[in-house]
UniProtKB/Swiss-Prot annotation:
The lineage of its organism: Bacteria, Pseudomonadati, Pseudomonadota, Betaproteobacteria, Neisseriales. ATP binds at residues 26-33, 144-147, 173, 181-184. It catalyses: (R)-pantoate + beta-alanine + ATP = (R)-pantothenate + AMP + diphosphate + H(+). Transmembrane segments: none annotated. Coiled coil: none annotated. Pathway: Cofactor biosynthesis; (R)-pantothenate biosynthesis; (R)-pantothenate from (R)-pantoate and beta-alanine: step 1/1. It comes from Laribacter hongkongensis (strain HLHK9). Its EC number is 6.3.2.1. Catalyzes the condensation of pantoate with beta-alanine in an ATP-dependent reaction via a pantoyl-adenylate intermediate. It is found in: Cytoplasm. This is Pantothenate synthetase. Belongs to the pantothenate synthetase family. Disulfide bonds: none annotated. The keyword Cytoplasm applies. GO terms for cellular component: cytosol.
Length: 277
């Protein structure tokens, strides 16, 4: 596996690589990331994984400084998974002037759901993903459905800006008890880890009610919020949206997604389930 640290080296490697699939990450890799790698290997002859903890997508008071940097373990996992190249730029390589004067500004959806609690987050995501697309020039790029809003924004960005990249969604990886795999799960104490699967259970309960024909979305959302809060969670949101557009859902719609973000202890977890009825 080649380890590439500069844009110049990445572009030189790319010229000889044939069809390439990219998996953008912030490191601290887990089985969910490796599932993205496996899908990427189906999409292209060569696979590039990027590791870059992107300051632009962290807000004030968030965990940029404490976000786990686990390079040696990540490198070993990627090599064992058969990745062809690891793109590992430092911050000055991607942001030579530190600040970024030109950004990719998503539409109003960036201010809803997670965006309402993380101002500027999706601008930072869209900007760094565009930079990675410009540098690596992948034919395909794999993104997990756990970050459903992020996936939607990237798909819309690629379509609207005619970026020549196939965006490949990959299903959420889960632990045996249903908890969505996340690098931030490592922040959980033993007791919090035991409680954490409740988020998925509440979303699954909403899904069952929707499949059974329930259309009182507000009551379903409120019941889930109340249950989580009774068990010590601080809930940012539980919302039922249109799966294809992330617009507000209306009674009787067939393609839905239930999205949630909530904190248990100091750890913010997100999850979602899709419904096709």
């Amino acid at each position: 596996m080649d380890i590439i640290r500069t844009i110049e080296e990445m572009r030189s490697w790319r010229q000889k690589a044939g069809r390439v699939a990219l998996v953008p990450t912030m490191g601290n890799l887990h089985e969910g990331h490796l599932a993205l790698v496996r899908e990427a290997k189906k999409q292209a002859e060569r696979v590039v994984v990027s590791i870059f903890v992107n300051r632009l997508q962290f807000g004030q008071g968030e965990d940029f400084d404490s976000y786990p940097r686990t390079f040696e373990a990540d490198r070993d996992k990627l090599a064992a998974a058969g990745v062809d190249a690891l793109f590992l730029p430092d911050e000055r390589e991607l942001y030579p002037r530190i600040r970024q004067d030109f950004n990719v500004e998503p539409p109003h959806i960036q201010d809803e759901l997670c965006g309402a609690f993380r101002p500027g987050h999706f601008r930072g995501v869209a900007t760094v993903v565009t930079k990675l697309f410009n540098i690596v020039q992948p034919d395909a790029a794999c993104f997990g459905k756990k970050d459903f809003q992020q996936l939607h924004i990237i798909q819309a960005m690629v379509a609207d800006l005619n970026q020549p990249v196939k965006v490949v969604p990959v299903d959420i990886g889960r632990a045996a008890d249903g908890l969505a795999l996340s690098s931030r799960n490592g922040y959980l104490s033993a007791g919090e880890r035991e409680e954490a699967p409740r988020l998925f259970r509440e979303l699954s309960r909403i899904r069952e009610n929707l499949i059974d024909g329930e259309n009182d979305y507000a009551s379903l959302e409120q019941d889930a919020r109340a249950t989580l809060e009774q068990h010590g969670w601080r809930v940012d949101y539980v919302e039922i949206r249109q799966a294809d557009t992330l617009e507000l859902a209306h009674a009787g719609e067939k393609r839905l997604v239930v999205l949630a973000a909530a904190r248990i202890g100091k750890t913010r977890l997100i999850d979602n389930v899709e419904i096709f009825r």
